[in-house]
């Protein structure tokens, strides 16, 4: 055990990221296939995925209470799970990039969306929703937003995203964020 747990920590982190990717991909696939599914089938599958996210969240909580070296690396995943559970973000791709702390890819996605809006491939409402999500994620990752982006965010951020940002800033500590995410899961089940 000369690595003093570094190898194990690295492998655990990789496994957790893969699990989060799988769940986010499942949510994204579900949204893409929504038209092909009847309402009950869609709701049931979404409920199952949210339950899996909740179980994953519980696992993270147990890991964090026993292994403090993982706390910083897992905090991004926690916020992504919180966003997915509370449905603050509607776009699984944004959640995944946020969890992996990939601001460059978020900015690339934003540029692609702006282009798609200009050529008519993306509706304005969907563009606005996804742009707000991406800008909020970038802000939470500590990225500097332009004055135009800040103005866009102020004008278009909904109550749910504002609450997500406020809560994630105020709570800060992993246990409190997990407690809120757990509460949101319970609320979503009702």
Curated annotation (Swiss-Prot):
Protein name, as recorded: Protein LZIC
Protein encoded by which gene: Lzic
Annotated disulfide bonds: none
One annotated GO biological process: response to ionizing radiation
Stated family: Belongs to the CTNNBIP1 family.
Organism lineage: Eukaryota, Metazoa, Chordata, Craniata, Vertebrata
Assembly, per entry: Does not interact with CTNNB1.
Classification via Gene3D superfamilies: Beta-catenin-interacting ICAT
Coiled coil start-end: 2-63
Pfam hit, one: ICAT
């Amino acid at each position: 055990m000369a690595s003093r747990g570094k190898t194990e920590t690295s492998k655990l982190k990789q496994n957790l990221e893969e699990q989060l990717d799988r769940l986010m991909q499942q949510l994204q696939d579900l949204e893409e296939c929504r038209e092909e599914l009847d309402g009950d089938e869609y709701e049931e599958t979404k409920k199952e995925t949210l339950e899996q996210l909740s179980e994953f969240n519980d696992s993270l909580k147990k890991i964090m209470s026993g292994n403090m070296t993982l706390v910083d690396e897992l905090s991004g995943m926690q916020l992504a799970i919180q966003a997915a559970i509370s449905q603050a973000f509607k776009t699984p791709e944004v959640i995944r990039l946020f969890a992996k702390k990939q601001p460059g890819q978020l900015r690339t996605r934003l540029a692609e969306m702006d282009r798609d809006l200009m050529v008519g491939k993306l509706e304005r409402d969907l563009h606005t929703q996804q742009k707000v999500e991406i800008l909020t994620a970038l802000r939470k990752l500590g990225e500097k937003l332009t004055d135009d982006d800040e103005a866009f965010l102020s004008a278009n951020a909904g109550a749910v995203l504002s609450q997500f940002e406020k809560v994630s800033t105020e709570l800060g500590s992993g246990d409190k964020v997990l407690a809120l995410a757990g509460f949101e899961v319970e609320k979503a089940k009702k």
